[in-house]
């Protein structure tokens, strides 16, 4: 910024948790043209037109990034969630389309933006929109929803930055190699990639353990072991088709997010990604979605491969007893190995999968801390980074968002209390007072 230019906005008199490379804490932050222009040393940037906000002891952190949140579905269901209204393991149980036309799609996306802003969420990943769901029961995951996102982005009406994964099969259901290849040829809407970006593809490898549909080396109580959801008459053909999907998408440079919960499906997915990376180089930031039964052996491979883990501690806490009922207590004891993942250096993103759960990152972090049996400020930092820094990396956007440093966007979440000073169990009681997107207020309590 030129020396003669003053800031548009200065926040001072509180704590700024930058989550930058040095994990610095500051007392002030200056913003101009939607980006951070100074941290701490802001006095010389205050001019007659600068808005100066006295934080009065409040805390600023980077805007929250819920890296697995079904926005249109959330907006259509809100204030209800699957857990508040009964759990069906997917979108089952809906009497009719939740969004039946363009007006309903727009209203749902805008409502999700309102809900996100009130929680300090400035970015989220919409994990699965596309032709695979064009005849879907809810209407919340269709190609038309992606088109509506693009229209809102180009009109400047989105209240969060959105990353999209395209879906060429059925949500929580089967997919075919032919449909996958056909879908990849479809055009992607043209938008500002810092507002709306289609990053890659979503694949459902299997189901979930409580529904006995995750593909596992274990046996469920009914004697079955699940299977892959990708098309094929036998396991070998299904594995080959899944591997082919991953190889095709990888060679295109697409990011690949794979819903994989069973240990057996996770092994197949990671092996396929590893082979694609070895043959073609690291072309996309791929990741496992959920990863309930990931083994220690596979977990140890992920950092070297650059493969991330996107998991939902709230779901782990809520469905643990159901997993035990399906597979036994011994399997539950090694499920969702969050602490091991962090310790090994796996790129871990925490998320909510809203509206499966409510989209409250504070509750998700509290659930993660309880699951991992950790507490204290360093543990809180680690968990907060899994909702800010690491999701920006997953988005391929760490150079311009996810932490507070000069040149990065001024996406800010202002809290009434410093989260590093509270016990994880008390984090849900910490209030969000203001949310800024690109230096503009999108929520104020």
Model regions: which residues?
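Nucleotide phosphate-binding/pyrophosphate-handling subdomain across enzymes
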Residues: 308
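Carbohydrate-interacting/catalytic domains
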Residues: 9, 444-445
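His/acidic/aromatic-lined binding-pocket segments of jelly-roll/cupin-type domains
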Residues: 9-10, 27-29, 412-413, 432-435
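Divalent metal-binding segments
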Residues: 2-185, 190, 197-265, 285, ...
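Short low-complexity, flexible loop/linker segments enriched in glycine and/or proline
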Residues: 52-53, 134-149, 271-275, 324-328, ...
């Amino acid at each position: 910024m030129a020396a003669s230019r003053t800031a548009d906005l200065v926040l001072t008199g509180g704590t700024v948790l930058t989550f930058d490379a040095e994990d610095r804490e500051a007392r002030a932050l200056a913003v101009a043209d939607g980006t951070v222009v100074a941290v701490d040393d802001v006095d010389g940037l205050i001019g007659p037109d600068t808005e100066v906000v006295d934080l009065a002891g409040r805390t600023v952190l980077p805007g929250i990034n819920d890296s697995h949140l079904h926005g249109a579905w959330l907006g259509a269901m809100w204030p209800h969630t699957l857990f508040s209204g009964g759990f069906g393991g997917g979108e089952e149980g809906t009497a009719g389309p939740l969004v039946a036309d363009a007006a309903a799609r727009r209203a749902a996306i805008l409502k999700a933006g309102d809900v996100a802003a009130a929680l300090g969420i400035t970015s989220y990943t919409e994990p699965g929109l596309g032709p695979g769901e064009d005849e879907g029961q809810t209407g919340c995951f269709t190609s038309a929803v992606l088109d509506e996102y693009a229209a809102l982005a180009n009109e400047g009406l989105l209240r969060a930055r959105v990353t999209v994964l395209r879906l060429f099969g059925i949500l929580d259901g089967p997919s075919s190699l032919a449909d996958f290849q056909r879908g990849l040829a479809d055009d992607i809407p043209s938008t500002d990639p810092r507002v709306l970006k289609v990053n890659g593809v979503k694949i459902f490898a299997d189901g979930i353990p409580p529904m006995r549909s995750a593909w596992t080396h274990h046996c469920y109580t009914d004697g079955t072991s699940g299977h892959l959801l990708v098309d094929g008459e036998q396991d070998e053909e299904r594995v080959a088709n899944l591997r082919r999907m991953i190889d095709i998408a990888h060679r295109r440079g697409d990011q690949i997010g794979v819903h994989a919960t069973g240990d057996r499906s996770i092994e197949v997915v990671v092996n396929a990604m590893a082979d694609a990376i070895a043959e073609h180089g690291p072309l996309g930031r791929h990741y496992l979605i959920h990863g309930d039964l990931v083994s220690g052996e596979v977990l140890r491979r992920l950092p070297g491969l650059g493969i991330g883990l996107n998991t939902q501690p709230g779901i782990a806490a809520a469905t643990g007893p159901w997993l035990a009922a399906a597979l036994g207590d011994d399997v539950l004891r090694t499920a969702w190995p969050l602490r091991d993942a962090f310790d090994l250096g796996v790129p871990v993103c925490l998320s909510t999968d809203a509206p499966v759960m409510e989209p409250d990152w504070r509750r998700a972090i509290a659930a993660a801390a309880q699951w991992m049996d950790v507490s204290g400020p360093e543990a809180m930092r680690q968990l907060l980074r899994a909702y800010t820094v690491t999701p920006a990396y997953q988005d391929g956007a760490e150079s311009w968002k996810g932490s507070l440093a000069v040149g990065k966007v001024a996406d800010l979440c202002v809290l009434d209390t410093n989260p590093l000073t509270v016990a994880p169990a008390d984090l849900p009681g910490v209030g969000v007072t203001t949310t800024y997107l690109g230096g503009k207020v999108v929520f104020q309590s």
